[in-house]
């Protein structure tokens, strides 16, 4: 069994926060003096210090920028930041590919966090990533996106070494040391830093109103030897699943809960983006797509629901989330979008199917419940069937709702058959 010296990359803008980064370095080494700390300067101007491993001009040149000595400092701030991100991504990527780093950490305000997070998002899921940031107590979705970046709030600004900031940095240093050592341990044991499994991985999308059906499908798949990853369909959940497909970590997809498309269409808070429903199709892996929770759009507190939706059927799911029923017209458009994205991206339509639960697409859409609306549902189903007619993507209709046990077992079993068919 080979062993490695744990190495941690520290990336940031040293021209504005050198003292803070040097303190971070000292705390990492105080925790374990054997660790190799690589300081990577992604700032605006060159900093001369013996502790800096990869200097700012090296990062800029790694981006491919020409004429560094004469033109770099004259770049507009936005262009300069983009250049440094591009260069830092290249530098850090090379270090990772050569097994020369086992974790990465940064400190920053909004600018430094933007640079560091852009670099970290290019690293694989499970590789240790930590940012101490002044913006970490707010909405960090634009920084974290679909990755596993850990954000730690700095409490005070990263501007001078006071006792509060030093305590936060000490904690962050200990955290990244522990994370990096755990990663190295996996490398030494497995030969790679990922979770070790010999099972084929399945991704399933879930929402509260599709939980019963998803759990039943999950249990069936697990009992038949699959490793199941459930993704909460909150925008970031769907994007995370798509990313893991791109990283070749999943062998099949049960996209039972495509509700993020409804939020994308109507401006809800759980929107993914236009790449949703494309990764598995482009990868050619087996997938079964359904229409879970397309009966709803998600907004914040009830008083925050846009006026144009106030006259619709609303359900206050909890104090933070209000559900709005999708209309017949919206459901028709959603059906068209699902079909179109699959048709445009599928390289193996023979391994892609769409399943429709005719008696309800969520726990709130069955007879007697608040969102039960056969006209809207039928518009959704018809649009999918019409748009996919003539394609090689098959559509299956079941006379049940999406949480029925018979539905769950049938759809899970069928996915396993498609995986076996692919080989």
Task: Name each model-derived stretch.
Residues 2-47, 103, 113-122, 126-131:
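N-terminal phosphate-binding or glycine-rich loops at protein starts, especially the Walker A/P-loop
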Residues 103-106, 115-144, 153-154, 229-233, ...:
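Short, acidic/small-residue loops that bind anionic groups at enzyme active sites
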Residues 106-125, 214-218, 366-373:
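Short Gly/Thr/Asp-enriched flexible loops that form oxyanion-binding sites at enzyme active sites
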């Amino acid at each position: 069994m080979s062993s490695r010296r744990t190495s941690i990359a520290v990336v940031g803008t040293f021209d504005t926060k050198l003292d803070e980064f040097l303190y971070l370095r000292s705390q990492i080494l105080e925790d374990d003096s054997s660790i190799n700390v690589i300081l990577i300067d992604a700032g605006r101007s060159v900093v001369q210090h013996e502790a800096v491993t990869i200097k700012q001009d090296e990062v800029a040149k790694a981006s491919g920028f020409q004429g560094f000595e004469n033109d770099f400092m004259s770049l507009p701030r936005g262009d300069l930041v983009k250049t440094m991100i591009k260069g830092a991504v290249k530098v850090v990527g090379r270090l990772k590919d050569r097994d020369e780093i086992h974790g990465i950490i940064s400190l920053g305000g909004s600018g430094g966090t933007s640079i560091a997070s852009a670099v970290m998002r290019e690293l694989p899921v499970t590789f240790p990533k930590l940012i101490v940031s002044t913006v970490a107590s707010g909405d960090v979705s634009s920084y974290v996106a679909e990755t596993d970046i850990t954000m730690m709030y700095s409490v005070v600004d990263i501007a001078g070494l006071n006792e509060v900031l030093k305590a936060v940095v000490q904690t962050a240093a200990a955290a990244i040391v522990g994370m990096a050592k755990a990663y190295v341990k996996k490398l030494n044991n497995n030969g790679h830093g990922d979770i070790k499994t010999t099972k084929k991985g399945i991704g399933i999308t879930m929402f509260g109103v599709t939980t019963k059906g998803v759990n039943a499908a999950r249990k069936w798949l697990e009992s038949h030897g699959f490793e199941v990853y459930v993704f909460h369909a909150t925008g970031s959940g769907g994007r995370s699943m798509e990313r893991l497909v791109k990283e070749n970590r999943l062998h099949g997809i049960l996209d039972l809960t495509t509700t993020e498309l409804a939020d994308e269409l109507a401006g809800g808070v759980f929107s993914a983006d236009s790449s949703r429903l494309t990764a598995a199709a482009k990868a050619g892996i087996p997938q079964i797509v359904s229409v879970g929770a397309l009966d709803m759009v998600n907004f914040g507190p009830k008083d925050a629901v846009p006026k144009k939706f106030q006259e619709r059927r609303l359900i206050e799911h909890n104090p933070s989330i209000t559900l709005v029923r999708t209309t017949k017209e919206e459901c028709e458009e959603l059906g068209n979008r699902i079909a179109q994205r699959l048709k445009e991206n599928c390289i193996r339509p023979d391994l892609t199917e769409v399943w429709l639960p005719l008696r309800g697409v969520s726990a709130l859409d069955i007879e007697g419940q608040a969102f039960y609306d056969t006209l809207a549902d039928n518009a959704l189903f018809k649009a999918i069937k019409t748009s996919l007619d003539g394609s090689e993507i098959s559509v299956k209709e079941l006379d049940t709702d999406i949480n029925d046990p018979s539905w769950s077992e049938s759809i899970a079993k069928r996915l396993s058959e498609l995986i076996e068919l692919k080989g």
